[in-house]
Amino acid sequence: MVLGFRRPPDTDGLLLVSALLLSLVLLFPSAGAADEPYARSRNYDLQNVRVHLWFDLDQRRIRGEADEHIAALRDNVAELKFDSVGLTIQGLTVDGMPTKFSTTGNNLIIPLVHPARRGEEHDIVIRYEGQPKKGLYFILPDKNYPEQPREIWTQGESEDTRYYIPIYDYPNDRTTSEMLLTVPASWITISNGRLMGVKSEADGTKTWDWKQSEPLSTYLISVVAGDFVQKEDSWRGIPLRYVVPRGQEYKIDSSFDHTKQMLDLFSEKLDVPYPWDQYAQTFVDDFVEGGMENTSATTLTVRELENPTLAAEDRTGSDYVESHELAHQWFGDLVTCKDWADLWLNEGFATYFEHFWNEQHYGADDSAYEFWREQAQWFRQKRLYSVPIVDRNSTDSEEYAGNIYTKGGWVLKMLREQLGDADFFRALHYYLETNRGQNVVTADLQKSIEQATSTNLDKFFHQWVYRAGAPQFEVSYTYDDAAHQIKLVVNQTQKVEGLVGLFDVPIQVEIATPSGRKSYPIEVSEASQSFTFPADAAPSMVLFDKGDAILKTVEFKRSPVELIYQLKNAETVPDRADAAVALGGIKDNSEVVAALTDAAQYDSFWGIRAEALRVLGKIGGPNAEQAILGAAGNGNEKPWVRDIAVQQLGKFKEDVSLAPKLAAIAANDKAYRVRAAALRSIAEIKAPNAYDTLVAAVKLESPDNVLRNAAVDGLGALGDDKAVSLLLDWSLPGKDLRTRQAAMLAVAHLDRKNKDITKALISYLHEPYFDVNFWVLFAIGERGDPDAIAPLQDLLNSGDVSLGERSIVEEQIALLKGRTGSK
């Protein structure tokens, strides 16, 4: 699963949230029930489920018949307990005989006439109806959005399948499935497995029959139905389905252009062919996540559809989410975590294979840069540091999503570094084949790798997976000219407490002198260690952990001359990026600015050019400004780099000559994203005519409303209360949802005494649109009005919020109380 709004590192200019909000967004949990960190004990095995669903669109109700085949797992099984929430059970048979049953708030309990023996099989048929609050969602036209295509879709992870099917709803069991979906004749449906047929019914509806012949965990069952447009293709004889809401079909080709290449890459590198009967990718409206890896049938948010007009401006498009969800078809679906505490076995692998796709398709530098950026982001999320990846003390599998995703991906990166490519991919092949169709825990992964490579990994898994944190190094060196020797002192400075200890890690040290370079492997395992290396002269450059092989922070003070040499000459992207960032701490040094200017113009990799521009924006001064202007106007530069350059211009608030230059970029640049960045920077520098420029830009039409949204965002940053009426108007129901998001966040910053703004934001809390519900919470928190505390508390008490939304609401209440000093 991809969490909502995760984006790769070239997209800073497209995000309409502050760094604080972004860190919270990246921690946003799935909309599931409270997770059980230990796998359940079971007294039966669910072997097959056949579900027929009918839908009442007007009432947003479902009617279902579930035929579930089970086998007892022990003797004397007197009753069967199915997970079921909010469903009215209308009738039930066991082996064809009507049977009494009882229900609780969370379960359907079925007593057996005679206690079952181990291996004894029974067939349970359940007739039911309900109006699901979770799990299954109706997206329908209403008075605000009358053109909205009709859609129904499900989201089972973590434990929400129980809201539309009475079923065993925990990942440590697998079942084959069949879904029969009776829908309007013009609709398309997607579900797991093979389409067995479509039958016309007497009432004018059609029933689609989907059959999943290989077992899956029930949270991976999927139903999608609605007014969709489908493009069909095939890969090695396997049907491919590309499905989008009607009206979005012009985005199909630009959004799915790499699917076949991804299938080739993953199948061949893992030496495990894609394992399912089809691969469908369906984009749906108002999805509660970025993407979900339902077996053979991924569901994705329409937010990730790639507008063909903007495709050339976006480095990877929707590749990151599509590669993530496709990787899950092996890691998460073919082999599935047994319990939620081991969810990193799903998400860490999918995150890693996002990077692997980028490495193979866009180049190793791209992948290295993304890992470097995510490392810094992970360390900024302080709450993650003291918690291990496998954490059985949490009842929410994604409370610490940054560990499951980001750190999980980094662990696999480090494992590949340690094992080498041949052993790493051999081990993954062995892991998948040995555990094919099984539910696993971390010990199964470790065992498979050890058996495939004859490598003991106890220490690796102990410190990186079962314990918390990562090493934080303080490094220094001295050069002894007489002895021709370098002494390197390494201290681990992380606070050793709880599950955070000292780390034992291999480190590559590279030393460059005028006569050449040489690398030395060392092992750091103590609180303080020193190492000596021969050197025929004072070093031009000393690299600690060349290439960023280890998840860590490093404080390593070096002279400007050394850092400039590293920026120009280090072989790897992370080492050059580290040098650029370190140079940002040096003020009033013309040589530093000149070196960063050279990097911004001439470095071979776009990410280093971007980092140099960011650092120049931080340093400031006329020379830095001229360098940034040069990058912004360089028509041969990549649009996402020019976007970053234009963002930096917003930091030069004292230069009145910038206003017309930014206005020209906003009006004339060939890239929409660069024009959008210019509008935001016009607001940041508070240009004399900024208000009029931004109001005029709100009226502009552009693909996906890129310019309007940037102008709305800019009006919030400008801080001119004249914009309140305009922004409130654009936040109203009926406006484009992305524009509403921008308007809500923007107006939250204006006229703090205006209670009408707070009332408007509060009124959006109960709208039936996830995109609105999510962002208005942050707008309310940013506004800081204590009048919102009671409505937020009422929302919590209502029970109408998911576990993920609950954590966000609680964050905003705490933020508001902190500002008022209340408890």
Predicted regions and their residues:
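Non-catalytic accessory/interaction domains
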Residues: R246, A327, A422, N435-K618, ...
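Structural detector for internal amphipathic alpha-helices that build alpha-solenoid repeat scaffolds
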Residues: D548-K552, P574-D588, D598, G607-G621, ...
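Short inter-helical turns and helix N-cap capping residues of alpha-solenoid HEAT/ARM repeat scaffolds
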Residues: E571-T572, S604-F605, N636-K638, K670-A671, ...
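Hydrophobic alpha-helical and helix-loop surface patches within well-folded domains
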Residues: W210, Y242-V490
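Acidic/His-enriched low-complexity segments
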Residues: S30-D277, A401-G402, E417-L419, N435, ...
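Amphipathic alpha-helical scaffolding segments comprising HEAT/armadillo-like alpha-solenoid repeats
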Residues: F556-L567, N589-Q601, G621-N634, K653-A667, ...
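N-terminal secretory signal peptides that target proteins for export/translocation
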Residues: M1-D12
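Bacterial N-terminal signal peptides
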Residues: V17-L27
